Amino acid sequence: MKIHTTAPLEDPRDARTIFPRLESIGYDGGFTFEAKHDPFLPLVRAAEHTTRLRLGTAVAIAFARNPMNLAHLACGMQILCGGRFVLGLGSQVRPHVEKRFSMPWSRPAARMREIVQAIRAIFDCWEGKGELDFRGELYRHTIMIPAFDPGPNPFGPPPVFTGGFGPRMTDVARHA
């Protein structure tokens, strides 16, 4: 059995001590979540101070970002974490998406499914598996020039997990 936990960080600088402590007491994974601080930044520090702990977001708000932004973040984090990164995405709730992030809210399960599909298409392009040609109902990613293509990740693309409530989002998570 593997044991993972989230690390509540009042100050993102605390990642340099909290995550090594989790590793030293036997946890297999340590995750951040989107609350007072961006969930990705503390993981950079955690990666510098750990060697085996799986690191990831549980969760980053997907609807506050676009698939290309998320793919670039995940690719960079996978490199910095030495192949230990997990991209965990969640939708948040409608009032926060619309009023806090000023982003559209529509068909959350379909949107989450398409975000994950688009991220995977972007990863495939970077891994040399063909041109970028993702054409969904909500997102389109159809151009990737060498200046923006990080190329194959030396650790492979990170896993993408989703979280959510209700049967539709559970179905998305099952197929993510």
Predicted stretch roles:
Residues 19, 33, 63-69, 83, ...:
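Conserved N-terminal glycine/acidic-rich loop preference
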Residues 1-57, 63, 158:
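N-terminal beta1-alpha1-beta2 module of alpha/beta enzyme domains
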Residues 38, 69, 111:
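Short acidic-hydrophobic sequence patches enriched in Asp/Glu that either
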Residues 10, 64-68, 72, 107:
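Residue-level signal for the nucleotide or nucleotide-sugar donor/cofactor binding architecture
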Residues 40-43, 70, 116:
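A general structural signal for well-ordered alpha-helical segments in protein cores
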Residues 28-33, 55-58, 80-83, 111-115:
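Glycine-rich loops and low-complexity Gly/Arg-rich segments
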Residues 72-75, 79-176:
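Internal, glycine-rich beta/alpha segment that forms the wall or movable "lid"
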Residues 14, 66, 169-171:
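Intrinsically disordered, low-complexity acidic/polar segments
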